[in-house]
Amino acid sequence: MSISVVILAAGQGTRMKSSTPKVLHTISGKPMLFHAIDAAKEISDDITVILHHQEERIQKEVEAEYENIIFHRQDAKNFPGTGGAMKGVYTRHERTLILNGDMPLIKKSSLEALTSGDADINMSIIRLEDPSGYGRVIIEDDKVVEIVEQKDCNEAQLCTQTVNAGIYAVDTALLERYIPLLRNDNAQKEYYLTDIVKMAVDEGRTVHPVYVEEEEFKGVNSKLDLARAEEIMQRRIKEALMMAGVTMCLPETIYIDCRATFEGECELENGVRIQGAAQLVNTHIKAHSVIEDSYLKNSDVGPMGRVRPGSKLVDTHIGNFVEVKKSDLNGVKAGHLSYIGDAQIGEGSNIGAGVITCNYDGKNKFRTIIGKNVFVGSDTQLVAPVCIEDDVIIAAGTTVNKDVEKGVLAISRTPMRTVKNFFYKFFGDK
């Protein structure tokens, strides 16, 4: 059966208390809406996103990441509510799945369950130990027969633990017939998507309950919800990676972006952050180090090292308090307290403690090129643009501000001198 997906993302999300649209708040490095789109793309090639609040901003970000997404603007002034969002929406396939853009935790398996079978409507249902505050979904003989608001429940209905999770898979022809019939004769003057369930039941149509996990279908409406969803997503990511062979020390202290990838034997120590689309191959990241959007192979970083976006490290050791930015290091050792930015460093080179690439003049960034087997002594400043050829020794404390040819010693120290008895002249006799 072919499936179309409609994602509701028009809401303002006032409870977020943020100028950022609710659906663009990130979970594990990716906007919530993108998680919903990713899930939808696993089952459908016809995806429509419903927008209203900050629609241009959201559409621009989605189009930068995805192709062939259809956008529909909700006329929220005349047709508010979830049902109003569907006014004027048309989909290609025989069945339409309606998702919420603020549910980033839904899995493919749940969407497949919701879109299987031949019921006119499949309705997501959660069982809650304490359903207080929720309307109850009344189910008889494995069919939904009624949705009752809590204030209207009788004593028996109040004991019902089944509630609406808010996701529906509907026969498209039926949906297109029901949506124009929706009315807003309620206290909020909104058009509710739940009314299509009542229409179907009244017509004797089959509304099938699909039981789902609360964890997956929990909407994110506040910063507290966002933090809780992040915890769940992080747990999933790390459990999957550990099952695939990644070693983690105190995984609850580690953060991993959902776009990061790992190959071979990788180890992450406590407090590590892997951000962006980082790629790690046979690499050891030591405690409290940060890796951002970079490629690392057969390397180790830290403790307390930082590799910033655009870097490539192969067979390289980056030690404590070393920062690397947009640099290509192959077979390099940089053990302590250095900044390497916009650099290319060749095999066998050693970067001493306190070495700095001076890559920025206040207006522009410049490159530092270091060849193979170069020894850069401690407290050296490399003033870019500069090129150091192979087999060079840079003496400690040198400021390199011009190119260095192969095989030489570069040194720029002033001669040391001593002043006799200066201590006693300065402090007096002790």
UniProtKB/Swiss-Prot annotation:
Tell me which InterPro entries the record gives.
Bifunctional_GlmU, GlmU-like, GlmU_C_LbH, Hexapep, Hexapep_transf_CS, MobA-like_NTP_Trfase, Nucleotide-diphossugar_trans, Trimer_LpxA-like_sf
Q: What is the cofactor note?
A: Binds 1 Mg(2+) ion per subunit.
GO biological process terms, alphabetically, are:
cell morphogenesis; cell wall organization; lipid A biosynthetic process; peptidoglycan biosynthetic process; regulation of cell shape; UDP-N-acetylglucosamine biosynthetic process
Keywords, A to Z, come to: Acyltransferase, Cell shape, Cell wall biogenesis/degradation, Cytoplasm, Magnesium, Metal-binding, Multifunctional enzyme, Nucleotidyltransferase, Peptidoglycan synthesis, Repeat, Transferase
Instruction: Name any cofactors this protein relies on.
Output: Mg(2+)
Reaction catalysis annotation: alpha-D-glucosamine 1-phosphate + acetyl-CoA = N-acetyl-alpha-D-glucosamine 1-phosphate + CoA + H(+); N-acetyl-alpha-D-glucosamine 1-phosphate + UTP + H(+) = UDP-N-acetyl-alpha-D-glucosamine + diphosphate
Among CDD domains, the record links this protein to: GT2_GlmU_N_bac (cd02540), LbH_GlmU_C (cd03353)
**What main location does UniProt list?**
cytoplasm
Q: What molecular function does GO assign, one term? A: glucosamine-1-phosphate N-acetyltransferase activity
GO annotation, cellular component aspect: cytoplasm; membrane
Q: Where is this region: Pyrophosphorylase?
A: 1-223
Residues noted as binding acetyl-CoA in the record, renumbered to the chain: 353, 359-360, 378, 396, 413
- Identify the Pfam families for this entry: Hexapep, NTP_transf_3
Active site per database record: 336
Enzyme Commission number(s) of this protein: 2.7.7.23, 2.3.1.157
Q: Where does UDP-N-acetyl-alpha-D-glucosamine bind?
A: 8-11, 22, 81-82, 135, 149, 164, 221, 308, 325, 339, 350
Q: Where is this region: Linker?
A: 224-244
**Pathway(s) the chain acts in:** Nucleotide-sugar biosynthesis; UDP-N-acetyl-alpha-D-glucosamine biosynthesis; N-acetyl-alpha-D-glucosamine 1-phosphate from alpha-D-glucosamine 6-phosphate (route II): step 2/2; Nucleotide-sugar biosynthesis; UDP-N-acetyl-alpha-D-glucosamine biosynthesis; UDP-N-acetyl-alpha-D-glucosamine from N-acetyl-alpha-D-glucosamine 1-phosphate: step 1/1; Bacterial outer membrane biogenesis; LPS lipid A biosynthesis
Binding locations of Mg(2+): 102, 221
Q: Where in the cell is it found?
A: Cytoplasm
Region: N-acetyltransferase; residue ranges are 245-430
Task: Relate the protein's function as given in its record.
Answer: Catalyzes the last two sequential reactions in the de novo biosynthetic pathway for UDP-N-acetylglucosamine (UDP-GlcNAc). The C-terminal domain catalyzes the transfer of acetyl group from acetyl coenzyme A to glucosamine-1-phosphate (GlcN-1-P) to produce N-acetylglucosamine-1-phosphate (GlcNAc-1-P), which is converted into UDP-GlcNAc by the transfer of uridine 5-monophosphate (from uridine 5-triphosphate), a reaction catalyzed by the N-terminal domain.
**What interactions and quaternary structure are annotated?**
Homotrimer.
Q: Give the family per the record.
A: In the N-terminal section; belongs to the N-acetylglucosamine-1-phosphate uridyltransferase family.
HAMAP family xrefs: GlmU
Q: What is this protein called?
A: Bifunctional protein GlmU
Originating species: Sulfurovum sp. (strain NBC37-1)
What high-level taxonomic lineage is stated for the organism?
A: Bacteria, Pseudomonadati, Campylobacterota, Epsilonproteobacteria, Campylobacterales
